Amino acid sequence: MADVNTWWVGGSLLLGIWAIVVFFSPDPLAQYPFINSKRPGELFYTQSKIRFITQARSLLKEGLSKTNNAFRLVTNNRILLVLHSKYRNELRDHKSLNNTKPPEDDFFGWLQGFEPFNHVKTNPKVFAAMVRTKLTPSIGAVGIPLSEETDFVLQQQLTDSSEWHQINVKETSLQLVARLSARIFLGPQVCRNPAWIGIMINYTVEAFMTAERLRMWPRWLLWLVHWFLPSCKKLRSQVQEARGIISQVLQQREQNRKGASLETEASDVDTVQWLEDCAKGGYYDPALLQMGLAVVATHTSADLLSQVIFDLCEHPELLQPLREEIVTVITQHGWSKNAIYNLKLLDSVLKESQRLKPMQINITLSDGTLIPKGTYIAMVDDHSLDPNSSYTNGDQYDGYRFIKMRDVPERAHQTQLVSVTSDHTGFGFGNHACPGRFFAATELKIALCHLLLKYDLKLGDQKPQAMTYGFGLSSDPFTQISVRRRQEEISLADGKS
């Protein structure tokens, strides 16, 4: 009995010491304004999180009005230090910032079913090397296969009917982007496998929704809870199904190699081979890396494609100039890298649609602003909120905005969709810029070339409304538009007139 009492007293003492340390230790972020802290009578941050989810834009605006340095914000994940955009250039290449840990923390990469978010298992260095040294240099070679697949998908999704008929823009965009990405990532057979395309589209949505449910539980209970949630079981099933599909691809590749000539072997030029080359014999998980590619590529690109389609329906005066540019450029350059670069108005339209969608050690910035070790940070990137926006009429859509800026010598290099600058960080900034943005830009331009030359587009009675969820701003998933087949001026499958 004495031993039990001793353990009880000892445990209580340790718990008391821990409580004192936690509750009475100085908050290293206390110097920064707290925008949505607990209100009187609120014991936990539950209501603060709800206010963030539903009112993030107004909270950001409030924060900017109170300080021009940094402020604290309760998000649905954690307390975040939000920095003013003036610090972007100072932090763009800071070696002490880690952009792989937040996704793993936010999406529970250590739990089964969430392995594609685990940076140890997916090995982001292999992924980044593949994108940088293999995918991006091959942009000039992906034009024709992407064009062929776009032609195939649009015929299935939009049909060849010359009568007006309705489509769901978001669903169509997801199918198109998933198939195009899979064509380059895994080849022509897998990109038409409904099971794989279903995983590419559905896994990310399911993972995001399940992560929200898990955040309602104490973190120390997640190792147990996730075994019983139906959505977690579904994620584990999808990971296993993905492993089966990729395993078949790898087995087929190995069989082909055994009896292949060098010419036949060279035909397998896609991310399966590229990832193996970049791993250089080191550890990586092919299935998880392919799922990771799907997570980062499918929904973000499909969301931008959807938004561009909505914006063009709301600004139909852009359709004919875009079609004229497409005909001129593709007739002259085919689907070469030069063609992608010279689609300048299309590039400007994409960048404008993207514009309107809007730490391991202590870091002290040049003005004395301190970022304590372990702090999660974000930066304001919504120029309709920032009073120091560098864009004229920044809250209005102007499809010609960036093509006009090309005439300004000091800004000409900043105007392309793939350019990353301090005032347009749709693809990130500095060392943290998205390495796959060149492929994404190519994919979207080719998809839009086919869509605009082959179909008339118009809005119905319902105007699309972007959906907000915390910091997230996504294109309308419900609004439909009307389309009908038109006769394209040139053949687009191979880029020849």
Swiss-Prot record:
Classification via Pfam families: p450
Protein's membrane topology: Single-pass membrane protein
Bilayer-crossing regions: 4-24
Any one cellular-component term (Gene Ontology): membrane
GO BP annotations, alphabetical order: mycotoxin biosynthetic process
Positions in coiled-coil regions: none
Residues where heme binds: C434
Subcellular location: Membrane
Record-linked Gene3D superfamilies: Cytochrome P450
Alphabetized SUPFAM superfamilies for the sequence: Cytochrome P450
Superkingdom of the organism of origin: Eukaryota
PANTHER family: CYTOCHROME P450, CYTOCHROME P450 MONOOXYGENASE AUSG-RELATED
Descriptive protein name: Cytochrome P450 monooxygenase PC-05
